[in-house]
Amino acid sequence: MSLKWSACWVALGQLLCSCALALKGGMLFPKESPSRELKALDGLWHFRADLSNNRLQGFEQQWYRQPLRESGPVLDMPVPSSFNDITQEAALRDFIGWVWYEREAILPRRWTQDTDMRVVLRINSAHYYAVVWVNGIHVVEHEGGHLPFEADISKLVQSGPLTTCRITIAINNTLTPHTLPPGTIVYKTDTSMYPKGYFVQDTSFDFFNYAGLHRSVVLYTTPTTYIDDITVITNVEQDIGLVTYWISVQGSEHFQLEVQLLDEGGKVVAHGTGNQGQLQVPSANLWWPYLMHEHPAYMYSLEVKVTTTESVTDYYTLPIGIRTVAVTKSKFLINGKPFYFQGVNKHEDSDIRGKGFDWPLLVKDFNLLRWLGANSFRTSHYPYSEEVLQLCDRYGIVVIDECPGVGIVLPQSFGNESLRHHLEVMEELVRRDKNHPAVVMWSVANEPSSALKPAAYYFKTLITHTKALDLTRPVTFVSNAKYDADLGAPYVDVICVNSYFSWYHDYGHLEVIQPQLNSQFENWYKTHQKPIIQSEYGADAIPGIHEDPPRMFSEEYQKAVLENYHSVLDQKRKEYVVGELIWNFADFMTNQSPLRVIGNKKGIFTRQRQPKTSAFILRERYWRIANETGGHGSGPRTQCFGSRPFTF
């Protein structure tokens, strides 16, 4: 490696370390190892919504000080799940305010008696604001519904010692102009029309504001001297893979640190010592996207071992992929080769579970993505679960990782209070997802009012901050503003633009799509000279509704919209368009309105994951593009299980 590159990596490491100090501690995904144990708390929790007028009865009566059932009637609530669709009560489905969860966990004796062991409580997602107590003692608070947070509860559970601990979590789903996403509480004061004290939650985003414990809650242990964080950056010189790492160890300043890199067969291909360094991998197997290489998604394992002078040892294994990302004036490059985003936008959304994590649904979705020939998706409009990103790493599905910056439309949402929180959210997001090879770009917002005057400073500050957190990935936000009015566009690396020609305007006029889309692309590129992704397009289709000639909301109309977009995209992808992401992968729930028939129906699959006509149109297109661009997929591959084919 050249001295120039060595100096760059040293400088980069110093910058990453300085940026990481903005957040206290790392956020490694909890997993078992020879030194770590894990206890999942998924299952039924006690649950109670605070129905008092001010929603503060739980705090006033200190429900956290005794078992929740002693405060009044409780429900059984599954975790993970949203609470909204679990009962038959519309009042709970639409509830705004504080809800309370409680669970008692039985602790292994060694957890409570071994003072050389840390016991950590981790909540992977609590939407939106959460306050947590253990045995009635406050341990942590967190704002934001999509990223994990932790509390070291060792002293609490080892002071007895105890055999159980009672975990109480209060969650408030109220959104304000300064939350992410923003919202507004509107009080209806006309008592001739509304009950006294009546209020509703207004939002400017088009999905249901599901709430609750959406992902797993776990207890895990580490030694008192432990691996706190790992940052990995990869590069390639000729056929040598370069893996630069920085490792944070907490609990002691006197330790030895060993690092090994193993290939998929378990063979050690490189090793090092010390808390920072660089591993060189001759003839490295690169991480390639699905359909871009005959062996996509190659993953190595970085095994880290820390040993103290007292012989306390901690182990952690981090899966990594060796790959590079770069952007030119008209191309998006992965490992130096042009990459075209042929993908979808998604939502974490399903029947009954709401936004609750569900393994069967997740695996089904990935099988559908590969059936489509899709190689990418955007985490619209918030960070998805870590398990989603782990599967993307394993399957080669490229990710545009989006924060919850959706619905930023009011002027007050561009103020300093909102900006401070947005910066913190990006720090949390980068800290969590920085080591995933599938993540190739950060998105800091979706459809903000970026033509407002404060947007220029807001997005310049936000994007500069995100780039300082991660120098290796491009940064974007998704715009629906006019090309010559968007004040944030000068600061992004890739233009992402949403448009719904013949849908939200020129209703039913399919003939305007191609000229309007062509003008859109030419205007954006002429103005900004950056690669462009068509980050949203589509039309609602009610399953089973057929009209010929096509009419809005029929499957034929959705099909015709896609075909008209594709005609222009086929021309522009030869120039500067680097991707297309259909809106949406599947139908999803929204607030009730005259414009939504039990949710948004722009999915190419139903909410139950059954294909509409447009799914077959997109499948044919994506496999054709993969073949035309030299992808390694001559068509869908079929694996047989008995007499039934399973296509993936």
UniProtKB/Swiss-Prot annotation:
Q: Which residues form a coiled coil?
A: none
The residues the entry assigns to the signal sequence are: 1-22
Gene Ontology molecular function: beta-glucuronidase activity; hydrolase activity; protein domain specific binding; signaling receptor binding
Its keywords, alphabetically, are: Endoplasmic reticulum, Glycoprotein, Glycosidase, Hydrolase, Lysosome, Signal
Q: What class of enzyme is it?
A: hydrolase
EC number(s) given by UniProt: 3.2.1.31
Q: Which reaction does it catalyse?
A: a beta-D-glucuronoside + H2O = D-glucuronate + an alcohol
Which residues does UniProt mark as catalytic?
447
Quaternary assembly:
Homotetramer.
Q: What does this protein do?
A: Plays an important role in the degradation of dermatan and keratan sulfates.
The record's NCBIfam families line, in alphabetical order, gives: PRK10150.1
What protein name is recorded for this chain? Beta-glucuronidase
Biological source species: Mus musculus (Mouse)
Q: Which gene encodes it?
A: Gusb
